[in-house]
């Protein structure tokens, strides 16, 4: 693939991932406050926050086959469409169960993270993938930094419906942008010739459990434990800050913006140089 074409595709992908994360992080910090308004317990809030990941995990094998068979672009557009629907449900939710439904719909729609990573694998040369993923991560972390204040200000200006509706509008913009500027990264003529082995996803998962001492499964375990710990903190952070320090929904953005800013500095300023100096494995 020509370098200019790969760069253009990567740029479009970075913008898509950034806008998607802004919409997501408009909602995540506010979700516990909305749930508490409906009388949810701390356990229910944690379940609510994890519903997206659980639904995404269950739907992942299906969307993996769709992505391989029909292309990355359609799978990404479906994920963005599911997110738009989920945000509208969130905006008008009047029970905890509708909040839960919004999370499940978004997760079952496939999300975007896996598809974005597959895009990078298709479009970028192997020696440049770590840097490309670093820039994608930096873009999403800029979204982490900017999404919470936008969500909190939307709540102030437009009340409870505002964050969900603005996040849905961002999703619709993102769909239009991706449709126009993000070309398919997979060679679909060749893809249709390749038959995906039945049960390949389950075999891969089993391999991670049964061959945990190998490099790839070990890396997956390290990542899973790290991201699991982070997500666990995120799920209860708003409740902890509200109970301990009286942080309200219109001020929670400060904490998430700080976290996102630190992540941007690490991913964009440190990761690429570290890979250049020590290599991907180290």
Language-model segment annotations:
Residues 2-6, 183-221:
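Juxtamembrane intracellular "pre-TM" segments in multi-pass secondary transporters
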Residues 6-32, 213-233:
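Pair of pore-lining "gating" transmembrane helices in MFS-fold secondary transporters
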Residues 29-42, 235-251:
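Short amphipathic helix-loop junctions that connect adjacent transmembrane helices
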Residues 53-61, 111, 144-145, 260-268:
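Residue-level signature of mid-helix packing/kink "hotspots" within the transmembrane helices
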Residues 57-94:
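Conserved MFS/SLC helix-loop-helix module at the cytosolic interface between two early adjacent transmembrane helices
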Residues 60-70, 266-280:
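Helix-to-loop junctions at the C-terminal end of transmembrane segments
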Residues 102-141:
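Cytoplasmic helix-loop-helix junction between adjacent transmembrane helices
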Residues 136-180:
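Helix-loop-helix hairpin linking two adjacent transmembrane segments in secondary transporters
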């Amino acid at each position: 693939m020509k370098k200019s074409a790969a760069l253009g595709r990567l740029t479009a992908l970075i913008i898509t991932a950034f806008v998607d994360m802004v919409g997501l992080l408009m909602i995540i910090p506010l979700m516990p406050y909305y749930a508490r308004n409906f009388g949810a317990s701390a356990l229910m809030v944690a379940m609510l926050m994890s519903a997206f990941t659980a639904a995404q995990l269950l739907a992942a094998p299906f969307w993996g086959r769709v992505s391989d068979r029909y292309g990355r672009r359609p799978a990404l557009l479906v994920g963005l469409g599911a997110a738009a629907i989920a945000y509208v449900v969130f905006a008008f939710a009047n029970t905890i169960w509708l909040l839960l439904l919004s999370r499940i719909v978004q997760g079952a729609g496939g999300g975007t993270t896996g598809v974005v990573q597959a895009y990078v694998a298709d479009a970028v040369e192997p020696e440049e993938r770590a840097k490309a993923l670093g820039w994608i991560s930096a873009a999403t972390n800029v979204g982490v930094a900017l999404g919470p204040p936008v969500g909190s200000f939307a709540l102030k200006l437009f009340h409870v419906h505002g964050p969900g509706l603005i996040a849905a509008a961002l999703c619709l913009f993102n769909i239009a942008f991706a449709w126009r500027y993000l070309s398919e990264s997979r060679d679909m003529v060749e893809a249709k010739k390749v038959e995906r082995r039945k049960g390949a996803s389950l075999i891969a998962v089993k391999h991670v459990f049964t061959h945990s001492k190998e490099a790839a499964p070990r890396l997956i375990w390290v990542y899973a434990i790290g991201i699991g710990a982070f997500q666990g903190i995120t799920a209860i952070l708003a409740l902890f800050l509200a109970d301990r320090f009286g942080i309200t929904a219109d001020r929670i953005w400060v904490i998430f913006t700080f976290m996102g800013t630190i992540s941007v500095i690490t991913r964009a300023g440190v990761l690429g140089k570290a890979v250049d100096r020590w290599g991907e494995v180290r």
